[in-house]
């Protein structure tokens, strides 16, 4: 283990002892915000320090076994102990290196998932609906909460565009690799000749700002228009201008919300989505240089960047970024994304390790 890494782990061990002392004090819950910060930090550091304690024990076992090697009668036993200790040290050091990788500050945040139909007309809109269901089913498996923010249904079903808010611990960390172009190959229900059609949708996954104020938005930079909602909604739908369109003039970002009968609620939702879009834009601009110098799974944020193909006749899904093909398309479309996400997270961690190696 490198000296720099061991020094960092020693610092974390000291910090954990400090946290244990702070959390054991009688008045610890007097400031609930501070208490939450301390417990969150404790939860993050605890497993790392525990792993480090196991590594130090393995190191002590290695030194003890080396001393036994001098005794001829104990040599076979000592060699077995030495091998076991070194194996444990190697495994624990590798796990610790992964645990110490830089954390994405957005990983724990709630998210907005925006799906837009692309090339392929009605078939693309239908696939947008399929993708939405896939993410909703995955969210259900994680016991996350889902809220529809905005939807623009297509004539034959599916969506021209849809935005949902997914709230749950680690939502961004699990779904941040979904941004990009998703291509589908299948025989549409309206196809009489049995020909396979190719269409596409784009997905954008944006971390939710903790508060609207986290992203600086000058009210003077906003143009807010109201109009009558369209689509399902019964008699009420054409009576009031409850739908809201918010335009952020400096960036040209436009958000429409019309799902609620309350203009106030639609405006509030639109501003939340707008804040997330601006935050997402700033994030990708900030990382543009990094994305240009090395391949990154999160990419440039370019919607046209094709990341995945869903081939229904062959029952396969291929993620082009990591050259992963899974022949379990039906399960994937039903929200079984664990294997795919685990592979993407693993590749991302490998990228981070490589970049740290380059920096050293």
From Swiss-Prot:
Positions of disulphide bridges: none
Modified residues (N5-methylglutamine): 235
InterPro entries given in the database record: PCRF, Pep_chain_release_fac_I, Pep_chain_release_fac_I_sf, Prokaryotic/Mito_RF, RF-1
GO molecular function: translation release factor activity, codon specific
Compartment annotation: Cytoplasm
SMART domains, A to Z: PCRF (SM00937)
Modification(s) after translation: Methylated by PrmC. Methylation increases the termination efficiency of RF1.
Listed SUPFAM superfamilies: Release factor
Pfam families: PCRF (PF03462), RF-1 (PF00472)
Keyword set, alphabetical order: Cytoplasm, Methylation, Protein biosynthesis
Cellular component, GO, one term: cytoplasm
HAMAP family for the chain: Rel_fac_1
Family: Belongs to the prokaryotic/mitochondrial release factor family.
Main function: Peptide chain release factor 1 directs the termination of translation in response to the peptide chain termination codons UAG and UAA.
Protein's name according to its UniProt entry: Peptide chain release factor 1
Native source organism of the sequence: Burkholderia mallei (strain ATCC 23344)
Upper classification of the organism: Bacteria, Pseudomonadati, Pseudomonadota, Betaproteobacteria, Burkholderiales
Gene: prfA
């Amino acid at each position: 283990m490198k000296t720099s890494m061991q020094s960092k782990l020693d610092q974390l061990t000291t910090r954990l002892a400090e946290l244990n002392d702070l959390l054991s004090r009688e008045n610890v819950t007097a400031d609930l915000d501070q208490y939450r910060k301390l417990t969150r930090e404790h939860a993050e550091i605890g497993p790392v320090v525990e792993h480090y304690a196991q590594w130090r024990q393995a190191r002590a076992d290695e030194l003890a076994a080396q001393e036994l090697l001098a005794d001829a009668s104990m040599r076979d036993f000592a060699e077995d102990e030495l091998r076991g200790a070194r194996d444990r040290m190697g495994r624990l050091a590798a796990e610790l290196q992964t645990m110490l990788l830089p954390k994405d500050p957005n990983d724990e945040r709630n998210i907005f998932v925006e799906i837009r139909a692309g090339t392929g007309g009605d078939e693309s809109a239908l696939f947008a609906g399929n993708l939405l269901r896939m993410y909703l089913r995955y969210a259900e498996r994680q016991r996350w909460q889902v809220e529809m923010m905005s939807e623009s249904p297509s004539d034959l079903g599916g969506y021209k565009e849809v935005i949902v808010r997914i709230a749950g611990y680690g939502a961004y960390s699990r779904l941040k690799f979904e941004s990009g172009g998703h291509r589908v190959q299948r025989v549409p229900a309206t196809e009489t000749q049995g020909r396979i059609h190719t269409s596409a949708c784009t997905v954008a996954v944006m971390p939710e700002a903790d508060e609207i104020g986290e992203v600086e938005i000058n009210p003077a930079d906003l143009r807010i228009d109201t109009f009558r909602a369209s689509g399902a909604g019964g008699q009420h739908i054409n009576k009031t201008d409850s739908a809201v369109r918010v335009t952020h003039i400096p960036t040209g970002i436009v958000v429409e919300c019309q799902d609620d009968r309350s203009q106030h609620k639609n405006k509030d939702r639109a501003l939340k989505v707008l804040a997330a879009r601006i935050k997402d834009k700033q994030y990708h601009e900030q990382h543009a240089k990094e994305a240009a110098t090395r391949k990154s799974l999160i990419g440039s944020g370019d919607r046209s960047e094709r990341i995945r193909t869903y081939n229904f006749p062959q029952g396969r899904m291929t993620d082009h970024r990591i050259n992963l093909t899974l022949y379990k398309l039906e399960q994937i479309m039903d929200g079984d994304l664990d294997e795919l996400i685990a592979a993407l997270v693993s590749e991302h961690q490998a990228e981070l390790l490589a970049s740290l190696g380059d920096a050293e």
